[in-house]
A protein has these predicted regions:
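Alpha-helical transmembrane segments and their immediate juxtamembrane cytosolic regions
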Residues: 1-247
């Protein structure tokens, strides 16, 4: 397969798919069973694997892992407010407080487990910890990231992509294994159709197989897109939340 897609192009595909998915939640609240919302949500399943993949790639390419980690957590905090505002369950300022209205799932955005996924990868590759300590820390991170969108599965997928770097088949197998666990929980706890629908993440693998290992051709465009990718997530959620709340 020809390597025709760079990182910027794959990330643009991811945010397009994400936007389609979030518009579907706005237009068709709940677990709508019509063909259009289901197709839109299937398209949306492209996003999380691509995001996880490039969080892991960022670990290997960043010049400063500490700044990279801080940046992810900063945008996780910012995105929490945008995510809560965009939620169909948003009532008032109390909705920004996790667990305030009960429930345990989807208390904050996917940026939270993505940031913890980077920490998980750092732990796995660290020489400071014994294998037992690494295992316990991974379990702890799973607990901390569990109540978010995509739960600890996003963190584990970052770990899978990072520790199997260069072996897309192994990356894909582990990613599908973790998402299958998520799909089972979704199937029994939330909605059967939408549980099965989570497995559409497999559609991201042919796209990742085309990744050429390059960030992009133009340095200025690369710098612009770096911040665009960070800012787009909370900004588009804020806009969708405003449409839902004031519309």
């Amino acid at each position: 397969m020809k390597k025709t897609l760079d990182a910027n192009q794959l990330k643009l595909i991811a945010i397009f798919a994400m936007t389609v998915d979030h518009i579907a939640w706005l237009l068709f609240p709940g677990y709508a069973k019509g063909a259009l919302p289901v197709v839109m949500h299937i398209i949306g399943r492209l996003t999380c694997p691509i995001m996880c993949y490039f969080i892991a790639e960022g670990y290997y390419h960043t010049r400063n892992i500490h700044k990279y980690t801080f940046r992810l957590f900063l945008f996780a905090v910012i995105s929490h407010f945008a995510y809560s505002f965009a939620s169909n369950n948003f009532v008032d300022a109390r909705s920004f407080i996790p667990f305030y209205f009960g429930g345990i799932l989807n208390q904050t955005s996917v940026m939270w487990p993505l940031a913890w996924g980077l920490v998980m990868l750092r732990v796995a590759n660290s020489e400071r910890f014994t294998q037992l300590q690494k295992t316990l820390l991974v379990i702890l991170i799973c607990l901390v990231s569990f109540p978010s969108d995509w739960s600890c599965i996003a963190s584990l997928c970052v770990l899978a992509f990072g520790t199997n770097r260069g072996d897309l088949k192994a990356q894909g197998r582990w990613m599908l294994f973790f998402v299958a666990l998520y799909a089972v929980v979704y199937f029994f706890a939330l909605d059967k159709l939408y549980g099965v629908l989570q497995l559409a993440v497999a559609l991201s693998l042919p796209l990742l197989a085309r990744y050429n290992g390059q960030r992009g051709k133009n340095a200025r465009v690369n710098k612009f897109l770096k911040w665009f990718f960070y800012l787009y997530y909370p900004l588009h959620l804020t806009i969708l939340g405003a449409i839902r709340y004031f519309g």
